[in-house]
């Protein structure tokens, strides 16, 4: 009998969060920039330049911010692991009892918890403490470069749509074309991310469409009233 491995959505949390955030931000922020500029009725080359600048600056900003944020998390994890390693060397018996207590709190009897702690300590003490005491494992472990690349790429991909629309859409209908294409792709992106994460597609689509409309509506209003470009 063949057993199929279960799909666990938590395995996707790290890269999915960065990718969805980047794509949403790239699409929505760049579209909002273009709509804000287009509402002031400028020339096409100004709209294209605004879209390109928004795409490049936004992608770099997302990547840098994600790298710094996840690097801080990684530094904290490394410090915790170093401290745990030192404690295992200096007071192994105390650490063994601490590990056993973790399993007791999860429902094991005192004897079973101690036996599990002993066996896992013999196998790999630091790994056992990192996983079960600190909550650090290969799935949730911080990966700064991976997160930064995902954010940069996803932002650029998201921003590519409004940039492309700015090249081909009629100037007088630019705002409507940008809004229409962006809402459709925001709905698609929301549905994909919800399905990949095991969440409700309907709620995800409604949420992303609502906030997308709010963001684009505000920039269109500001651009129309004041004739300025806002992001």
Model-inferred region functions:
Residues 1-69:
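Internal alpha-helical transmembrane segments
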Residues 172-185:
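Structural signature of hydrophobic alpha-helical transmembrane segments
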Residues 57, 61, 158, 162, ...:
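Alpha-helical transmembrane segments of multipass membrane proteins
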Residues 15-33, 138-164:
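Transmembrane alpha-helical segments and their cytosolic interface motifs
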Residues 188-213:
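Interfacial loop-to-transmembrane junctions
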Residues 220-231:
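Juxtamembrane boundary at the C-terminal end of a transmembrane helix
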Residues 1-11, 70-152:
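Cytosol/matrix-facing amphipathic helices and coiled-coil assembly/linker segments
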Residues 25, 64, 103, 113, ...:
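Residue-level signature of catalytic and energy-coupling elements of molecular machines
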């Amino acid at each position: 009998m063949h057993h199929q491995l279960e799909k666990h959505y938590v395995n996707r949390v790290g890269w999915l969060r960065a990718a969805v955030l980047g794509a949403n931000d790239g699409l929505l922020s760049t579209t909002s920039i273009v709509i804000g500029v287009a509402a002031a009725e400028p020339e096409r080359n100004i709209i294209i330049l605004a879209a390109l600048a928004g795409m490049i600056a936004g992608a770099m900003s997302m990547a840098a911010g994600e790298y710094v944020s996840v690097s801080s998390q990684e530094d904290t994890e490394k410090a915790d692991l170093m401290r745990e390693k030192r404690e295992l060397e200096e007071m192994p018996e105390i650490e063994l009892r601490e590990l056993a207590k973790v399993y007791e709190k999860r429902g094991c009897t005192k004897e079973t918890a101690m036996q599990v702690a002993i066996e896992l300590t013999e196998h790999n003490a630091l790994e056992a403490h990192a996983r079960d005491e600190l909550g650090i494992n290969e799935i949730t472990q911080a990966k700064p470069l991976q997160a930064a690349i995902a954010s940069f790429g996803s932002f650029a991909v998201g921003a590519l749509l409004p940039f492309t629309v700015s090249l081909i859409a009629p100037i007088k209908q630019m705002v409507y074309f940008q809004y229409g294409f962006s809402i459709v792709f925001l709905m698609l992106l929301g549905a994909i991310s919800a399905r990949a994460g095991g969440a409700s597609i309907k709620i995800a689509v409604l949420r992303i469409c609502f906030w997308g409309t709010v963001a684009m509506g505000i920039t269109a209003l500001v651009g129309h009233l004041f004739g300025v470009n806002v992001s």
